[in-house]
């Protein structure tokens, strides 16, 4: 393939000036063969399986990073949902399992490990219940473990008993990590239609239909897309879409190249490339900045949802041409604390929780990294989750909620997490009650569009 000098310079510019990086190389590992009734034996089995497969992951990704000169920000692991593989264990809680995952992650040198997870969209098994009840202590006593719970699908509807439970779990997790502004909640996500091959945290787990070991890659390039849009001379929206498509193709192609080389060197399957635009707290490396480059005064004003729909669609169209295997979440992320433009919009009063909810109907993945007052009730948190699950269920898409009820904080305050997690201004929630609705429980039935056979 002929590569022109200007293409090489363009790639260098993306990395040096526009914050382009491979956000994550995530290794998925199957733990189903590790099951045992003795919790100590089970913990030993999963530790050996994870460290056996992942011992060369960090070294290999760093070699590939040096080979191509493309930064790889995070190395991560996703495992089979622990609620499934630990159900046979004779134990009352799974905190020791979370600590084993954390130790394995530490020993192989990765950034995060996902899969402290349960799939409860149609009902809750004893193993699911043990895992859910273990989440607050598990996340408080570990550094790298991430938890996720799938409570809804388009085919099954919404398990409102699980939704009600998760409101309390989010509150307890915030309280258990109150010394760090409730950071445990940044490692807990509640899903509708959770994908089995998502490389991004906190929602990554290794699905039941996956191979024994696989490499999935997530890219990041809002700064590159932002620059591409701003360089256009008085474009119409069709021309903006075309520019985003071309840029997404280039970004995705680099991710594909890196992912395949890592998987080749590790001798494991290449799974998927996740096309998602993942922002960082860096100025300009922002999804909100792209929307403002299209002509909005600030993210959150009228027209924001339409601009985001254009962006999300163009990213998918361009990215899908660059990879044979696209998967995961694949869209544009709107995590408030991780996006400098979103933070600014909230502080200006332009971006509300209700507007963010509308935006989630046209992008991936949901209400993400949003700080709310610490005294918000569990029922209100559950109701916010239920609203977001309904959007996912009806629209046949992945949606999620990652809320931080910041202990001791009120509207106007902010919480500082640092690093990629950034800073979150505390946002207003409705002062009116949803408690009676949430207390009814049961299941919201699957919609008519679930009947596809």
Curated annotation (Swiss-Prot):
Transmembrane segments: none
A family per Pfam: DUF711
Classification via NCBIfam families: PRK05313.1
The family this protein is said to belong to: Belongs to the UPF0210 family.
Family annotation (HAMAP family): UPF0210
UniProt-recorded name of the protein: UPF0210 protein Mbur_0828
Species the sequence originates in: Methanococcoides burtonii (strain DSM 6242 / NBRC 107633 / OCM 468 / ACE-M)
